[in-house]
Amino acid sequence: MLKQKYKSEVVSALVKEFQYSSVMEVPRIEKIVVNMTAGKEVNNSKAIEEVLNELTLITGQKPYQTVAKKSNAAWKLRKNMPMGGKVTLRKDRMWDFLEKLITVAMPRIRDFRGANHKAFDKNGNFALGIKEEIIFPEIEFDKIRRNKGLDVIVVTTAKTAKESKRLLELLGMPFDDKKHTKESAK
């Protein structure tokens, strides 16, 4: 459904707004990378297994296990030790996940005012950190031992952050453009 919206509405709106000479210049979403780590429980093999199972439930795709690049004595971490999991979503699974994220998961975030409008890099990619994975309907609250959170990176073909932000806005991603101060939060 989101894919059809992109093709029918978003492409034409972006062509008008940014004056592209060809439809092929319009930015599109290449892939979505979802990453989750076990955090403090990296030494616990059951926690790693739980991370991989949760990622499978959330994304509908089997994750691959991520490992530590360097040893770190403070975290009791050795090189090549399992840390979590990562999934790269493309094509239909990517569109399905993005639609679920925008329409189901984000409205369930407590005190949510919109995604950070500054979370774009210079190449137009968007990064979103989610503190609780229980916002996804596939995760049962009673079955998780501890909230681990996850990272969602949306990789686009946009040349600038402005183009990428507009693309995601037209797809329905809510952004927090207002500057919240401590007084307005009270």
Curated annotation (Swiss-Prot):
The record ties this protein, via Pfam families, to: Ribosomal_L5, Ribosomal_L5_C
Q: Which keywords accompany this UniProt record?
A: Ribonucleoprotein, Ribosomal protein, RNA-binding, rRNA-binding, tRNA-binding
**Is Transmembrane given among the entry's keywords?**
no
InterPro entries given in the database record: Ribosomal_uL5, Ribosomal_uL5_bac-type, Ribosomal_uL5_C, Ribosomal_uL5_dom_sf, Ribosomal_uL5_N
- What would you give as a GO molecular function for this chain, any one? rRNA binding
Q: How does it assemble?
A: Part of the 50S ribosomal subunit; part of the 5S rRNA/L5/L18/L25 subcomplex. Contacts the 5S rRNA and the P site tRNA. Forms a bridge to the 30S subunit in the 70S ribosome.
Known function: This is one of the proteins that bind and probably mediate the attachment of the 5S RNA into the large ribosomal subunit, where it forms part of the central protuberance. In the 70S ribosome it contacts protein S13 of the 30S subunit (bridge B1b), connecting the 2 subunits; this bridge is implicated in subunit movement. Contacts the P site tRNA; the 5S rRNA and some of its associated proteins might help stabilize positioning of ribosome-bound tRNAs.
Judging by the UniProt lineage, the source's domain of life is Bacteria
Q: Which family does it belong to?
A: Belongs to the universal ribosomal protein uL5 family.
Q: Which organism is this protein's natural source?
A: Mycoplasmopsis synoviae (strain 53) (Mycoplasma synoviae)
Q: Name one GO biological process term.
A: translation
A GO cellular component term found in this entry reads: ribosome
Supply the name of the protein.
Large ribosomal subunit protein uL5
